């Protein structure tokens, strides 16, 4: 996993916050601190295996459809399926999705629709928790977006942004992951031509996505969790605007950041 993200392990899925008094539903992560891997290691393992490029990689985990992840995986998979926010511990509703996931050429639009329909009606211990986000990233479009982001970051007409006004996609404080579309549209407020190029490329990079009106997070909140409204949603996150110390201190290891700055 890129250094801007908390390292996740590759062990079996368990409910997070199991030792706390969380009353609301837990969200999904994997294992603990003993066995971990980075996205770069995962990528190298795929490359060294000689099995070729995957049709898709599905992440049944939190905060995995970020531009940083897509950049590192761009050469080992055609698509990435996952959630830009936390996902409930129930995870992907495989019974509903398997009909498409098992195909050589899945219908990604249907996968997103079925996922959102499931989580729009999700309940936990008899209470309604209608929260979910999903997106599909086309990795063949990552290089084009990276080249465009180089131009954007070098632009002399970038508008200032207020971090707290951006669409946060997590419960960290300060946030680590922001909606990429919201961030770039904010800084390109005074450059309509460059913004038009970005919007066009974003639509190619994230061809399918879905979201409920809010997302749910268990981080740094009360025992019932916390619901965050989604006012804008591009289906992909970026950590560039984050002032979180963990993000800022790891930029020298962030391959996407180094490629675009």
Give the role of each language-model region:
Residues 2-261:
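Terminal, contiguous helix-loop blocks that mediate binding/assembly
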């Amino acid at each position: 996993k890129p250094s801007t993200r908390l390292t996740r392990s590759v062990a079996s899925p368990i409910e997070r916050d199991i030792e706390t008094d969380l009353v609301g539903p837990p969200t999904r992560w994997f294992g603990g601190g003993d066995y971990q891997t980075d996205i770069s290691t995962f990528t190298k393992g795929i490359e060294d295996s000689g099995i070729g490029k995957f049709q898709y990689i599905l992440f049944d985990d939190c905060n995995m459809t970020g531009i940083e992840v897509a950049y590192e995986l761009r050469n080992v998979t055609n698509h990435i399926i996952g959630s830009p926010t936390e996902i409930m511990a129930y995870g992907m509703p495989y019974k509903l999705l398997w009909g498409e996931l098992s195909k050589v050429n899945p219908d990604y639009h249907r996968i997103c629709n079925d996922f959102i329909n499931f989580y729009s009606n999700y309940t936990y211990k008899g209470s309604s928790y209608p929260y979910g986000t999903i997106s599909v990233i086309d990795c063949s479009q990552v290089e084009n977006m990276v080249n465009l982001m180089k131009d954007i970051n070098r632009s002399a007409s970038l508008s200032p942004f207020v971090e707290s006004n951006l669409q946060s996609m997590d419960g960290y404080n300060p946030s680590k992951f922001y909606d990429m579309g919201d961030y770039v549209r904010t800084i390109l407020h005074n450059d309509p031509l460059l913004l038009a190029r970005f919007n066009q490329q974003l639509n190619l990079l994230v061809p399918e996505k879905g979201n409920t009106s809010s997302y749910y997070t268990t981080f740094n909140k009360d025992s019932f969790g916390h619901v965050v409204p989604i006012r804008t949603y591009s289906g992909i996150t970026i950590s560039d605007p984050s002032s979180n110390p963990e993000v800022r201190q790891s930029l020298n290891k962030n391959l996407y950041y180094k490629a675009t700055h």
